[in-house]
């Protein structure tokens, strides 16, 4: 038995930030770039053994994360700096470990989570941006953020989100519990901030797509409630683009004592 095999297995959680614009999503896939594949490769180099990670939320192609949480198991005995600075040295520049925490055996990045929070960032200006073009969604028509805010409040609580669910969604149920949804303007940026126990596929982007129709004056404020009641995806607006969406935080029971960082995206006020 090798010295590595004699070491006890420990479970470690990491906070991950990434720019998803050059990846085909979080999940490892054959022959395409994924965030999971890059992270596992870097961790395996530091651990000197194969590492498999489990995440809180599998983001789609082009979607970003400032508050993704993962866990993995390893026999490798390393200082915390190895799992942060060491792993970051082996990662591409658009993925970074933000924190590390040793967690008990019952912790699971996905199944221990009690809520997930996303922010969708709209650059609301008649001319398109260049510097942040892969980190925001450009919408050239003027948006009334206060109108969007009022229209969105009907989504609070536990509801059937069939009208905002992708056709290919594999979830067993369309019911989700939305804890808050806020629409706020920061200068030229309009941010939709939504927190729920979980999300059906494309739920945030489908909600934002419809809210932009309300904000632009193309639909009345009451339209969001009508869509929710209709339970018909074909009645809602087109899915908003991926580049404006960020997974910004994941909630866990307090006894895990995971680090809490500023929400992000970092170019906006928290």
Swiss-Prot record:
Active-site residues, record numbering mapped to chain: 60 (nucleophile)
Please give the residue ranges the record annotates as the region RNA binding. Answer: 107-111
- Keywords annotated in UniProt: Isomerase, tRNA processing
Q: Which GO terms describe its molecular function?
A: RNA binding; tRNA pseudouridine(38-40) synthase activity
Q: Where is this site: Interaction with tRNA?
A: 58, 78, 110, 126, 139
One of the protein's GO biological processes: tRNA pseudouridine synthesis
Enzyme class comes to isomerase
Q: What is its EC number?
A: 5.4.99.12
Catalytic reactions on record: uridine(38/39/40) in tRNA = pseudouridine(38/39/40) in tRNA
List the residue ranges of the region (Interaction with tRNA): 168-172
Q: Give start-end ranges for the coiled-coil region(s).
A: none
- Which residues does the record give as substrate binding sites? 118
What quaternary arrangement does the UniProt entry report?
A: Homodimer.
Biological role: Formation of pseudouridine at positions 38, 39 and 40 in the anticodon stem and loop of transfer RNAs.
* Family matches, as NCBIfam families: hisT_truA (TIGR00071)
Similarity-based family: Belongs to the tRNA pseudouridine synthase TruA family.
- What this protein is called in its record is tRNA pseudouridine synthase A
- State the organism named in the record: Klebsiella pneumoniae subsp. pneumoniae (strain ATCC 700721 / MGH 78578)
Classification of source organism: Bacteria, Pseudomonadati, Pseudomonadota, Gammaproteobacteria, Enterobacterales
Name of the encoding gene: truA
